[in-house]
C-alpha cells in the first residue's frame, strides 16, 4: 500500500462498499486504493479535484462513484464517462467491470495525462482515454451507456452527447441536489426513465442519479 493511503482509508473503502451492496474482490480493493494514491499524488500539481483532504476522497470520490454501480447493467458493455476530470466515475467503473469497455473523455490535457497514467499503472486494459471536447468526439459506434458526474446542466449534457448514443443508450447523470429546474429545459426527445436518491457513506448532502433515454 502506498504511503499516501492509510489503513483507515482501506477500512473506510471496505466498509462503505459493503454498505452500498458492492462486494469488492481483493484485487478491486487494491486497485481502488492505488487509484486513490495516484489521485492524492497528482492532485497537488494538476488540480484534479477541489477535494484537497485525502481523508475526504474515499467518501466523496470512491464511494460516490460506487453508489451508482448497481445501475450499470450487465447487458451494457460499452460505456463513456463524459467530462471525467480526475476519473470519477469512469476509473472505478473500469476497475469493477474489467470485461466492459470504458472510455473516459476530458478536454483538459493535464487531466487526460493523469488518466493515461492511471491506465498504465493499474493495468486497466479495458480503459480508453480521450482528450477532446465532447462535441468534437466522433466514436466509431454508439455507446451503450453515457455517464457524467457534476459535468454540466442536464440540457447541455444531453445536447452535447446526443450524437454519441442512440435510442438504445442509457444516459446516467450523477447530481447533488435534485435538478428539478434543469429538467424543465430537457430536450424534447429525451425522457427521464428513472430518478434515484442515493445515500453515500461518509457524505453529507443530497445525491441523486437520473437515468434518461432518447426517444428518437
From Swiss-Prot:
Keyword terms, alphabetized: Cytoplasm, Methyltransferase, rRNA processing, S-adenosyl-L-methionine, Transferase
Segment forming the signal sequence: none
Predominant subcellular localization, coarse grouping: cytoplasm
Known EC number: 2.1.1.170
Annotated binding of S-adenosyl-L-methionine, by residue: 83, 88, 134-135, 149
Catalytically driven reaction(s): guanosine(527) in 16S rRNA + S-adenosyl-L-methionine = N(7)-methylguanosine(527) in 16S rRNA + S-adenosyl-L-homocysteine
One Pfam family linked to the record: GidB
Enzyme class: transferase
Protein's job: Specifically methylates the N7 position of guanine in position 527 of 16S rRNA.
HAMAP family: 16SrRNA_methyltr_G (MF_00074)
Similarity field: Belongs to the methyltransferase superfamily. RNA methyltransferase RsmG family.
Protein name: Ribosomal RNA small subunit methyltransferase G
Species lineage: Bacteria, Pseudomonadati, Pseudomonadota, Gammaproteobacteria, Pseudomonadales
Amino acid at each position: 500500500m502506498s504511503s499516501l493511503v492509510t489503513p483507515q482509508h482501506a477500512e473506510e473503502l471496505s466498509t462503505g462498499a459493503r454498505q452500498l451492496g458492492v462486494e469488492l474482490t481483493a484485487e478491486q480493493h487494491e486497485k481502488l486504493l492505488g487509484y486513490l494514491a495516484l489521485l492524492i499524488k497528482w492532485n497537488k500539481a494538476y488540480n484534479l479535484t477541489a477535494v484537497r483532504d485525502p481523508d475526504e476522497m474515499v467518501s466523496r470520490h470512491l464511494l460516490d462513484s460506487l453508489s451508482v454501480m448497481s445501475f450499470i447493467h450487465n447487458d451494457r458493455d460499452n460505456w463513456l464517462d463524459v467530462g471525467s476530470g480526475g476519473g470519477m466515475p469512469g476509473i472505478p467503473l473500469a476497475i469493477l467491470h474489467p470485461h466492459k469497455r470504458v472510455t473516459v473523455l476530458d478536454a483538459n490535457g493535464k487531466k487526460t495525462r493523469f488518466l493515461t497514467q492511471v491506465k498504465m499503472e493499474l493495468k486497466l486494459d479495458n480503459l480508453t482515454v480521450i482528450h477532446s471536447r465532447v462535441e468534437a468526439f466522433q466514436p466509431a459506434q454508439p455507446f451503450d451507456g453515457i455517464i457524467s458526474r457534476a459535468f454540466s446542466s442536464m440540457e447541455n449534457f444531453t445536447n452535447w452527447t446526443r450524437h454519441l448514443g442512440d435510442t438504445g443508450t442509457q444516459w446516467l447523470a450523477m447530481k447533488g441536489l435534485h435538478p428539478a429546474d434543469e429538467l424543465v429545459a430537457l430536450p424534447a426527445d429525451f425522457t427521464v426513465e428513472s430518478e434515484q436518491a442515493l445515500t453515500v457513506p461518509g457524505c453529507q448532502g443530497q445525491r441523486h442519479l437520473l437515468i434518461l433515454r432518447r426517444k428518437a
